[in-house]
């Protein structure tokens, strides 16, 4: 399960001017919350920002910056990744008419918001996993892969037993597909076209990295006839190797 969206970054400019005069060592704290509600972003994250400015033992002014922000949930593989926020700080000390002042200018650049994917008609949402569409019209493995790409998704890759069960449920709703070479299998996004027996995903990742390697039985994959180079799934959720030119139903996936 898996991609990039380009939106302008969000910049927040904070300026604080500290007037020294005869006051004690100044401490500036600012707490900035998320961008205004009217900003159309898909996943706003609260953040907390603070600056502490003081004079050290040598008489120099220093500023300490602290930034805390929320966690973004990235699409592509159901993994939580912390986006990088950039903090730039400039501090200057000036004297005007005998009065010293410290000026701190801080720019916080937040990552661009992630837009929600556009889901084509016919896809069903499975919570946490993604969107799936069962194509009943039989196609070859290559035709199925292209159709999924045209819909903005990809030929499904099974990453867990839970995902296998989702596909089993979709498969169970179709008893027979007219024109299919075999009604016991559906195409999925793995193959061993490059090296026999070494199955990889349509993205070039080894099958072992998907998190799901359960074959339909202990015999598979057997490369029967010497030309079974494309992946399929049995109604029991197990994997099998199938000739790529066969025409089978298939499932497309759009990741969360």
From Swiss-Prot:
Organism: Periplaneta americana (American cockroach)
Disulfide topology: 148-252, 230-244
Other remarks in the entry: Calcium is required for lipopolysaccharide binding.
Protein name per Swiss-Prot or TrEMBL: Hemolymph lipopolysaccharide-binding protein
PROSITE patterns noted in UniProt: C_TYPE_LECTIN_1 (PS00615), C_TYPE_LECTIN_2 (PS50041)
Removed propeptide positions: 22-33
Cross-referenced Pfam families: Lectin_C
Domain C-type lectin: 146-256
């Amino acid at each position: 399960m898996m991609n990039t969206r380009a939106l302008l970054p969000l910049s927040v400019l904070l300026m604080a001017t500290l007037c020294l005069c005869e006051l004690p060592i100044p401490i500036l704290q600012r707490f900035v919350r998320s961008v205004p509600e009217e900003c159309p972003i898909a996943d706003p994250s609260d953040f907390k920002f603070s600056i502490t400015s003081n004079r050290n033992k040598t008489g120099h002014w220093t500023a300490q910056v602290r930034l805390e922000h929320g966690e973004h949930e990235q699409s592509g593989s159901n993994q939580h990744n912390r986006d990088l926020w950039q903090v730039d700080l400039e501090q200057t000390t000036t004297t005007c008419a005998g009065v010293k002042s410290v000026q701190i200018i801080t720019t916080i650049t937040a990552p661009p918001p992630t837009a929600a994917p556009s889901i084509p008609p016919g896809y069903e949402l499975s919570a946490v996993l993604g969107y799936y569409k069962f194509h009943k019209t039989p196609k070859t493995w290559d035709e199925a892969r292209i159709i999924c790409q045209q819909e903005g998704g990809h030929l499904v890759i099974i990453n867990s037993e839970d995902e296998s069960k989702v596909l089993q449920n979709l498969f169970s709703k179709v008893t027979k597909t007219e024109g299919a070479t075999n009604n016991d299998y559906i195409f999925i996004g793995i193959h061993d076209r490059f090296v026999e027996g070494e199955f990889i995903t349509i993205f070039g990742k080894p099958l072992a990295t998907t998190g799901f390697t359960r074959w339909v039985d202990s015999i598979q994959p057997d490369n029967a006839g010497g030309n079974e180079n494309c992946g399929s799934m049995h109604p029991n959720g197990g994997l099998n190797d199938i000739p790529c030119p066969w025409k089978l139903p298939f499932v497309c996936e759009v990741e969360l």
